[in-house]
Amino acid sequence: MAMTAEVKDELSRLVVTQVSSRRAEVASLLRFAGGLHIVSGRVVVEAEVDQGSIARRLRKDIFDLYGYNAVVHVLSAGGIRKTTRYVVRVAKDGEALARQTGLLDLRGRPVRGLPAQVVGGSVADAEAAWRGAFLAHGSLTEPGRSSALEVSCPGPEAALALVGAARRLGVSAKAREVRGSDRVVVRDGEAIGALLTRMGAQDTRLTWEERRMRREVRATANRLANFDDANLRRSARAAVAAAARVERALEILGDTVPDHLAAAGKLRVEHRQASLEELGRLADPVMTKDAVAGRIRRLLSMADRKAKTEGIPDTESAVTPELLEEA
């Protein structure tokens, strides 16, 4: 099941006992999935959704909360309609329902955003508003570079109201107009997870987070694999160059090299692939990596000074293109 369908399936089965939250969900669902129509001079309320469980939930809530009977019409897939759709319609008491849910104001004019009682309601009402909006026109993409939780909105006012509701929940959401359609988008992974939990889709959040973590691990592994060969080549060349310079330094200094510098140099030559930290552990007594690096620097510096004085090739002369090619 796609992530969007999983979220909607879980939300449609969520048990909500608080009346104000149930009212906020119904109002939001009707606002984002529906519309008001005038049929034979009467106001008809309609909401079109993509799952039968959502339609049944809405019909039940309308009856439980307002006492009105809603009819569910099934629009089977076919022609330009790719999937089966469900239309919840209240005809006989449409105007009364529209007024009670806040779709119409006191003067009988359509409300363009979310109803005032939802906007000014509790945090639980804000959660319910998001739940209703997502059940109506929400989508959740698989975790990835362009993962997003989106809700298509009936207009900019409704989009801004939904952004405000998200802000009350501590979630950053943005209103966007995409190809003439108003949308509210949440892109941050942590914010998406938090919003799923707030809406009541905790199980789906866990699934989404698991897939997100797996994808991040794979992406990290791919990045490491892409750079691994280059890093290994660079490391190998650096090790070969360092060992060659140290060998040349020991040749230049001969018996005049101080014992402690000679010991550090021999460690570098004998353990070409070891890190400075590993060389420090191999030393007797044990040294820090900074101490090892310092002794090797002094060894090379001493040898280069002597080479310059005597007019002979210095330690850099040991690092030839042929040597690096072989690394």
Swiss-Prot record:
GO molecular function (one): DNA binding
Protein keywords: Cell cycle, Cell division, DNA-binding
Annotated spans, Disordered: 307-327
DNA-binding region, residue intervals: 275-308
A Pfam cross-reference name: WhiA_N
Keyword Glycosyltransferase listed: no
Entry keyword annotation includes Cell division: yes
Origin superkingdom: Bacteria
GO BP terms: cell division; regulation of sporulation
General function of this protein: Involved in cell division and chromosome segregation.
Similarity comment: family membership: Belongs to the WhiA family.
Protein name: Probable cell division protein WhiA
Organism of provenance: Mycobacteroides abscessus (strain ATCC 19977 / DSM 44196 / CCUG 20993 / CIP 104536 / JCM 13569 / NCTC 13031 / TMC 1543 / L948)
